[in-house]
């Protein structure tokens, strides 16, 4: 497994692989890998000849009072896991390598898609995501890039970015990996104490409840949101950031639930903010 911390030698490596006609699969991560990340890697292994994983906790996508400093990091453990999965190459740059002194160019996807849900709760977050992803795509020049559906809003924004800017990469989305009790796998789950960890299943249970209501015929998005909110409030440790029901993939508000749509949640369990979603379809 090759390991790079600098852009230049990585680009040389990628150019060699391309000369040999190999298909490059890319999995961008912030490290502290769990089975959700590894499911992206496994999918990449199936579809690409060479799999490159990046590990970079991107300072641009964290707000001033967010968890950038305490975001979990363990490069040694991550590298061992990736080696085990048969990854070809890992790129783990420093912030200084990615954002050279005087860096002042940003990529921004505008419109409702970045203004609602996490865009509303975390201003500037998706500007940071779009900028780093564009940089990584330019550095790695992958044929395929793999993203998890757990971060559905991020996934839809990146798909739009690729479409709008004619980037030469195919985005592959991979279903959310869950713990046995339904909790979506996330590096931030490590912040939860045992009591909070138990309480955190409220997100998955609330989504299941929402799905049941839709299957039973509920088509009013406002009423569905209310019922899900009431359900979440039965958990004393939970504090709702948002519950949204929107069309997919443009994340527009709906008057009536039809076609492909998302039920998306952001909920604080203690001081930890967790997100989850179901993507559903009705006639």
Curated annotation (Swiss-Prot):
Binding residue positions for beta-alanine: 61
Domain of life: Bacteria
Major subcellular location class: cytoplasm
UniProt catalytic activity: (R)-pantoate + beta-alanine + ATP = (R)-pantothenate + AMP + diphosphate + H(+)
Pfam families: Pantoate_ligase
Database matches in Gene3D superfamilies: HUPs, Pantoate-beta-alanine ligase, C-terminal domain
Gene Ontology biological process terms from the UniProt entry: pantothenate biosynthetic process
GO function terms (MF aspect): ATP binding; pantoate-beta-alanine ligase activity
UniProt entry tagged with the keyword Oxidoreductase: no
Pathway: Cofactor biosynthesis; (R)-pantothenate biosynthesis; (R)-pantothenate from (R)-pantoate and beta-alanine: step 1/1
Catalytic residue list: 37 (proton donor)
GO cellular component terms, semicolon-separated: cytosol
Ligand binding (ATP): 30-37, 148-151, 185-188
Enzyme nomenclature, EC number: 6.3.2.1
InterPro entries: Cyt_trans-like, Pantoate_ligase, Pantoate_ligase_C, Rossmann-like_a/b/a_fold
Binding site for (R)-pantoate: 61, 154
SUPFAM superfamilies xref list: Nucleotidylyl transferase
Note: The reaction proceeds by a bi uni uni bi ping pong mechanism.
Family membership: Belongs to the pantothenate synthetase family.
Quaternary structure and partners: Homodimer.
Annotated function: Catalyzes the condensation of pantoate with beta-alanine in an ATP-dependent reaction via a pantoyl-adenylate intermediate.
Name of this protein: Pantothenate synthetase
Lineage: Bacteria, Bacillati, Bacillota, Clostridia, Thermoanaerobacterales
Gene: panC
